[in-house]
Amino acid sequence: MQYKKPLVVSALAATSLAAYAPKDPWSTLTPSATYKGGITDYSSSFGIAIEAVATSASSVASSKAKRAASQIGDGQVQAATTTAAVSKKSTAAAVSQITDGQVQAAKSTAAAASQISDGQVQAAKSTAAAVSQITDGQVQAAKSTAAAASQISDGQVQATTSTKAAASQITDGQIQASKTTSGASQVSDGQVQATAEVKDANDPVDVVSCNNNSTLSMSLSKGILTDRKGRIGSIVANRQFQFDGPPPQAGAIYAAGWSITPEGNLALGDQDTFYQCLSGDFYNLYDKHIGSQCHEVYLQAIDLIDC
């Protein structure tokens, strides 16, 4: 896949905090290719859950419950690592976001990614849970459960490592998430069959997860992702997926070109696979393979409901 060269940005030091002004609008920081059949506008907010590419190919496309990713205060997205979450849309755990905007995911449950306050996104490994976001905007995911990602306050997205859950968002903006799988049925002649699923082209999201304050909750409009604090979902200089700004942080590679595929996964340009890379107890999410602790995943879009 061919991408446009990232636009050059200039740093301004008018105050003790660095700011930057792109030479062109940051919304032009987009891949050159687009995903066939992808939708760039979605009518409601949604979370994401981490699903391993290897297991996704063999899983049944039936209704299931997942946890959403969480977000911490920095904007990171994170996901949990070991537990699986709970419903005719199937349910998943959402990723969480911490305050910095990162997205993270947990190690062993499939949970949704969370976002911490700095905007990073993190996610967990094996349960299906929603990603969470911490305050810095990062997105992280847990190791083993499929849960939704969470976001911490910095905007990172993180996900846990062992359960499949939806992501959540913490105060720094990070996104965290865990993961899940679906089962097959057996008919009387002994054959094992997977249920066929028909998706609505206008609404390919067929999984739901419980929403909470740390769950990464995103909006998609004209190919631009924003979290509940209005920060921009971007691929930053180190290839990590997190939420910052607006505008995105200096050196951001992509800040637009997002879509939801006909299969219900988040895509950037014509790419619908990402990488969760282990960082302590959480995975950070990237658009490229950056090391031996990285695994290819899908970021499954999930509708968020009050539980």
Swiss-Prot record:
It comes from the Eukaryota. One of its GO terms (cellular component) is fungal-type cell wall. Covalently linked to beta-1,3-glucan of the inner cell wall layer via an alkali-sensitive ester linkage between the gamma-carboxyl group of glutamic acids, arising from specific glutamines within the PIR1/2/3 repeats, and hydroxyl groups of glucoses of beta-1,3-glucan chains. One of its GO terms (biological process) is fungal-type cell wall organization. The keyword Acyltransferase does not apply. Belongs to the PIR protein family. Component of the outer cell wall layer. Required for stability of the cell wall and for optimal growth. Required for resistance against several antifungal and cell wall-perturbing agents. This is Cell wall mannoprotein PIR3. It comes from Saccharomyces cerevisiae (strain RM11-1a) (Baker's yeast). The gene is PIR3.
